[in-house]
Amino acid sequence: MAEKEKWGIANIYSSFNNTIITITDITGAETITQWSGGKVVRADRQESSPFAAMEAATRAADDAKEKGIVGLHIKVRAPGGNGPRTPGPGAQAAIRALARAGMRIGKIEDVTPIPHDGTGRPGGKRGRRV
């Protein structure tokens, strides 16, 4: 019988300041590799750029391939909560780079935390007065 293919989960956290890519096994319990935009570029202002996300995703995919992972289910997360609910500029670039690196892509889902009327937004009763 043929050996079963190993799949993993790619957690992509993309804010407007950075992009963090963590690849875990299928249970999500064991981290295989973790890369961020800040690890691959030198300037702080470029951490969130699509180029940094692409570079981080490529390196993460290489690490995962070494461990024998052939496919990934992708979970995209934005800051959420009181922060923005849209992923940063690196999310799409990271997904594309993972696919281009030769990883098979399974499900892509959005796991941004959404408050069910939790705490109030920063700014107070009268908002931010400029």
From Swiss-Prot:
Subunit relationships = Part of the 30S ribosomal subunit.
Chain positions covered by the region annotation Disordered: 108-130
**What GO terms fall under cellular component here?**
ribonucleoprotein complex; ribosome
Task: List the Pfam families hit by this protein, alphabetically.
Answer: Ribosomal_S11
Q: Which family does it belong to?
A: Belongs to the universal ribosomal protein uS11 family.
Q: Give the organism's phylogenetic lineage.
A: Archaea, Methanobacteriati, Methanobacteriota, Methanomada group, Methanobacteria
Name this protein carries in UniProt: Small ribosomal subunit protein uS11
Q: Is Mitochondrion tagged as a keyword?
A: no
**Biological source species:** Methanothermobacter thermautotrophicus (strain ATCC 29096 / DSM 1053 / JCM 10044 / NBRC 100330 / Delta H) (Methanobacterium thermoautotrophicum)
Q: Ribosomal protein among the record's keywords?
A: yes
Keyword annotations of the record: Ribonucleoprotein, Ribosomal protein, RNA-binding, rRNA-binding
Gene Ontology process terms (BP)? translation
What's an example of a GO molecular-function annotation for this chain? structural constituent of ribosome
- Please explain the role this protein plays, according to its UniProt record: Located on the platform of the 30S subunit.
